């Protein structure tokens, strides 16, 4: 976590299990686990890709310190997180100081238990060397090299393992002065036994100074740089640093973030957290939330006394936990299709549709009166034959409120932003909620959509021609409360000019 915190071990009482949350994202109906789907991860042009070269975003949760809340780290809880929350990555936080590994090296056995569970469940796992009060990673560099030599020797051939070698350097420790030299040595230790699994390196000022790392990157091609934030404390300046680092070709991983302030206890700050999550999803940045614990603090995911083995009801989740679960589930079928969200039927199922296309929509922006419409769509082929994406036209209907022109941007596309073309048009019959539409089409480079496949997220941002604020509540295609993907018939899809999905205004 970002700052030192009082660590209070709470006596756990097992709550009575009542109605289980929602419908689990059951893996019994899936053909593959996340690791089976994506395999060996690597870095390509500063972005995380899978073994097919396809960009992937990891989303998950971190344990709290194993010395205090290690009982929550087990196969049953991790299976529940995979199946119900939709995680594709779990972070096991092994503190070094504060009664951690340095004084209690047996904690490494809990790390091994977590890795074995992740291997069995087919999810990625981050082995976190959690420096914090020991602000300079060089203090325990010798122990770090011994530990990671063992881990790399054990798991060098396991594609789901990720090494995080310095959680949060702080206290005046800088990238060039202390962190980079340390990382060079520990990376060499790992690479002597594991040539290619990802390595995450913390940055200065509690893993905020990614700009320094971006300006002097490590030579290892599969290294990522950690940024940590707490939504109640950290804002736009850190998002700007992510943009800067990515512009320099540095691969960024938000390996820890919280809905609270930096103390871990103020909040939760959910609007600020949503702004962050939208941003990270826009940029394709992987993220892990802090933390899986029932500790009495705002950033804890569980309510006091929650079961240590999963099966959590809504009453077992904290406010933060409910929010984080929703965010992970909302993105669970994006960036690689790890687990599908529970489908919902369109408003008028079948009305106006003639083909085998389903369009899902989510509202990316919770402010309907700011300066942009931010929407995301995902298209599925539910038929038995391939669909050529360049034959499809997606229409998002809105009312321009008398403002001419439009400025259009593709913020993210799983098929590649360069394969998305946007323009505006006018419907045959204007209404008080639709006198224009944004047309989203695919270039030939997007390829075809095979039966049962989906495009993944395509995210489009629409500004008025004069950059003034908009009024989305007056737009036909707008869904104010559709913050998770749902089948949405107020956005239409045409295939070679024929309406195959949705209801025109």
Swiss-Prot record:
Residue segments, region Catalytic: 32-334
Catalyzed reactions: Endohydrolysis of (1->4)-beta-D-glucosidic linkages in cellulose, lichenin and cereal beta-D-glucans
Location (main, coarse): secreted
Reported pH dependence: Optimum pH is about 7.0.
One Pfam family hit: Cellulase
Compartmental location: Secreted
Temperature note: Optimum temperature is about 42 degrees Celsius.
Function per UniProt: Endoglucanase with some exoglucanase activity.
PANTHER family attached to this UniProt entry: ENDO-BETA-1,4-GLUCANASE A, GLYCOSIDE HYDROLASE FAMILY 5 DOMAIN-CONTAINING PROTEIN
UniProt-recorded name of the protein: Endoglucanase 5
Source species of the chain: Pectobacterium carotovorum subsp. carotovorum (Erwinia carotovora subsp. carotovora)
């Amino acid at each position: 976590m970002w700052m030192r915190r009082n660590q209070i071990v709470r006596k756990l009482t097992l709550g009575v299990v009542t109605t289980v949350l929602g419908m689990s994202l059951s893996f019994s109906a899936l053909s593959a686990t996340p690791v089976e789907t994506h395999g060996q991860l690597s870095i390509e042009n500063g972005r995380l890709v899978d073994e097919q070269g396809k960009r992937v975003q990891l989303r998950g949760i971190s344990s709290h310190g194993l010395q205090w809340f290690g009982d929550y780290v087990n196969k049953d809880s991790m299976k529940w997180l995979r199946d119900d929350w939709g995680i594709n990555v779990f972070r096991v936080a092994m503190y070094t100081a504060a009664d951690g590994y340095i004084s209690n090296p047996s904690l490494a056995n809990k790390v091994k238990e977590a890795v074995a569970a992740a291997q069995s469940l087919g999810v990625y796992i981050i082995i976190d060397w959690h420096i914090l009060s020991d602000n300079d990673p060089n203090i325990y560099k010798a122990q770090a090299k011994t530990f990671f030599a063992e881990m790399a020797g054990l798991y060098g051939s396991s594609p789901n393992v990720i090494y995080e070698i310095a959680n949060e350097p702080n206290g005046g420790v800088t990238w060039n002065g202390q962190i980079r030299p340390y990382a060079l040595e520990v990376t060499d230790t790992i690479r002597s036994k594991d040539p290619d699994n990802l390595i995450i390196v913390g940055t200065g000022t509690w893993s905020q100074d990614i700009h320094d790392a971006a300006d002097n990157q490590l030579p290892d091609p599969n290294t990522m740089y950690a940024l940590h934030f707490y939504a109640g404390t950290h804002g736009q300046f850190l998002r700007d640093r992510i943009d800067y680092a990515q512009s320099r070709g540095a691969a960024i991983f938000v390996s820890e973030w919280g809905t609270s302030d930096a103390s871990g206890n103020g909040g939760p700050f959910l609007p600020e957290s949503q702004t962050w999550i939208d941003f990270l999803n826009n940029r394709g940045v992987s993220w892990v939330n802090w933390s899986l614990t029932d500790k009495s603090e705002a950033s804890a995911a569980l309510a006091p006394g929650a079961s240590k083995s999963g099966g959590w009801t809504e009453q077992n989740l904290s406010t933060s936990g409910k929010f984080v679960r929703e965010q992970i589930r909302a993105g669970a079928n994006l960036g690689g299709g790890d687990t599908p969200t529970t489908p919902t039927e369109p408003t008028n199922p079948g009305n106006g549709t003639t083909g085998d296309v389903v369009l899902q929509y989510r509202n990316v922006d919770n402010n309907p009166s700011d300066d942009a419409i931010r929407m995301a769509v995902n298209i599925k082929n539910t038929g038995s034959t391939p669909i050529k994406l360049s034959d499809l036209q997606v229409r998002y209907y809105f009312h321009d409120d008398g403002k001419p022109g439009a400025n259009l941007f593709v913020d993210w596309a799983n098929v590649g932003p360069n394969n998305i073309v946007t323009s505006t048009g006018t419907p045959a019959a204007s209404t008080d909620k639709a006198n224009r539409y944004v047309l989203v089409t695919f270039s030939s480079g997007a390829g075809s959509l095979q039966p049962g496949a989906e495009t993944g997220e395509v995210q489009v941002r629409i500004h008025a021609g004069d950059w003034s604020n908009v009024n989305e509540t007056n737009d036909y295609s707008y869904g104010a409360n559709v913050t998770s993907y749902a089948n949405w018939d107020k956005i239409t899809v045409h295939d070679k000019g024929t309406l195959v999905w949705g209801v025109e205004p």
